[in-house]
Amino acid sequence: MVVLHVKRGDESQFLLQAPGSTELEELTAQVARVYNGRLKVHRLCSEMEELAEHGVFLPPNMQGLTDEQIEELKLKDEWGEKCVPSGGSVFTKDEIGRRNGQAPNEKMKQVLKKTVEEAKAIVSKKQVEAGVFVTMEMVKDALDQLRGAVMIVYPMGLPPYDPIRMEFENKEDLSGTQAALEVIQESEAQLWWAAKELRRTKKLSDYVGKNEKTKIIVKIQQRGQGAPAREPVISSEEHKQLMLFYHRRQEELKKLEENDDDSCLNSPWADNTALKRHFHGVKDIKWRPR
């Protein structure tokens, strides 16, 4: 199996393995699915952390309004009254004004937070360092864990406009957000290796050869963005160590320049004629007038 270290720009994303005979049409779609799936997990984790702290989403027409404005406009959060957390709620005001402030109790909050940490670990970039291959099954498992935790804490479900529910139903609206710029559609995805685009009409082995033990770094890119930057000759960690070495060397040379004491030149070992006198047997001869 060929090992693919998938990157986006200079950032490591995940490891994937595929036979050399894999069609690049299929492989590109697979990489894009895992890449987008990981983004989805991270978006859900971010929103679920807010859910644990401040409760469900307010209706769009109530978001950002003060309590006085809501009373004046006679607006009512009907879904907020239905979607009550299991075990009761604790009021924690959302300063941003996106959520209703009816947070779950401490026990239910920990259920959400623990599940979020576990899901993050499954799709973490640290899996690259650990040598763990991330598959679509692992991404789905992380999503199922998150869905299960929400069902435990909110047995009555979430409002239809809550971004967590919309993510689970694949109805999320990312337009105008930074998250929208990160997503790469399967049909628009490109894989690059060694400054060459891996054409969808070919097989992986057409580029990397027949050796199934090959490991390559591929970069996923949106069509039309051009070739990604080449990999640096040395990694950022190696560059850091190199700079540290030269800094230490400079400090040592600076100290040597400051230490201009030449008294050591009077030492026996500094006498360049000592060896000659030793062989002539004239070592330690003292001359004095009679």
Curated annotation (Swiss-Prot):
An annotated GO cellular component: ciliary basal body
InterPro entries cross-referenced by the UniProt entry: CFAP298
Compartment(s): Cytoplasm; Cytoplasm, Cytoskeleton, Cilium basal body
Presence of keyword Iron: no
Example GO biological process: cilium assembly
Signal peptide: none
Cystine pairings recorded for this chain: none
Alphabetical UniProt keywords: Cell projection, Cilium, Cytoplasm, Cytoskeleton
Pfam families, per database record: CFAP298
Family listed: Belongs to the CFAP298 family.
Quaternary structure and interacting proteins, as annotated: Interacts with ZMYND10.
Reported function: Plays a role in motile cilium function, possibly by acting on outer dynein arm assembly. Seems to be important for initiation rather than maintenance of cilium motility. Required for correct positioning of cilia at the apical cell surface, suggesting an additional role in the planar cell polarity (PCP) pathway. May suppress canonical Wnt signaling activity.
PANTHER family per record: CILIA- AND FLAGELLA-ASSOCIATED PROTEIN 298, PROTEIN C21ORF59
Protein name: Cilia- and flagella-associated protein 298
Gene that this polypeptide is encoded by: Cfap298
